[in-house]
């Protein structure tokens, strides 16, 4: 599980998309697609590629899902025993999940929705976040991440070394009719706050 599903299971239900839920499942296996098509589920499984990152296992954790409360427990080793009412899941960490979400802006996730999700990410792990940004293959996702990070004064933001992140070249249209953010060369809502420039590290 990853993306928006991982964030919801981690407690970000208040930002869930209304209507029938999608399960963001990351796999490049043809067999996985065949199995999912045969399942009868109360949510729509949506299969996505794991090729967004150079390290397919980077930031993926084994965590217990409480089947009663539908909440995730802390990350654990894959061989750990879980209570009988728990199901062990391979799920994206918050750091990986938010980049998976940003890669789908504005295709399946709106800019404002992504901004709301980012507001709650107060405790990201700087080392893992930096590694994921360096491994991420989506220039758009990385630029959006750094743009949103510039809106907040979270402690982990100061540890991100922008000079080690490949942000590509050229402009990216994210919001049609928006203004161009000069720091990251992406279009953002005209009424939004400008990103606060930071000295390169």
Predicted ranges, named:
Residues 2-7:
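Leucine-rich, amphipathic alpha-helical/linker segments
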Residues 8-201:
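Phosphate-handling catalytic interfaces
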């Amino acid at each position: 599980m990853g993306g928006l599903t991982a964030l919801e299971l981690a407690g970000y239900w208040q930002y869930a998309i209304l209507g029938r839920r999608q399960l963001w499942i990351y796999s490049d296996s043809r067999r996985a697609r065949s199995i999912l098509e045969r399942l009868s589920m109360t949510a729509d499984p949506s299969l996505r590629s794991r090729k967004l990152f150079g390290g397919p296992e980077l930031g993926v954790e084994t965590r217990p899902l409480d089947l009663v409360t539908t909440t995730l427990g802390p990350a654990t080793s894959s061989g750990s025993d879980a209570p009988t009412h728990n199901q062990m899941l391979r799920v994206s960490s918050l750091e990986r999940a938010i980049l998976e979400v940003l890669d789908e802006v504005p295709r399946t996730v709106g800019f404002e929705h992504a901004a709301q999700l980012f507001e709650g990410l107060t405790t990201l792990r700087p080392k893992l976040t930096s590694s994921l940004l360096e491994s991420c293959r989506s220039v758009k996702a990385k630029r959006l991440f750094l743009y949103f990070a510039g809106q907040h004064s979270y402690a982990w933001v100061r540890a991100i070394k922008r000079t080690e992140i490949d942000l590509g070249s050229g402009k990216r249209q994210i919001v049609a009719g928006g203004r161009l953010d000069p720091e990251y060369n992406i279009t953002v809502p005209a009424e939004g706050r400008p990103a606060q420039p930071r000295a390169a590290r």
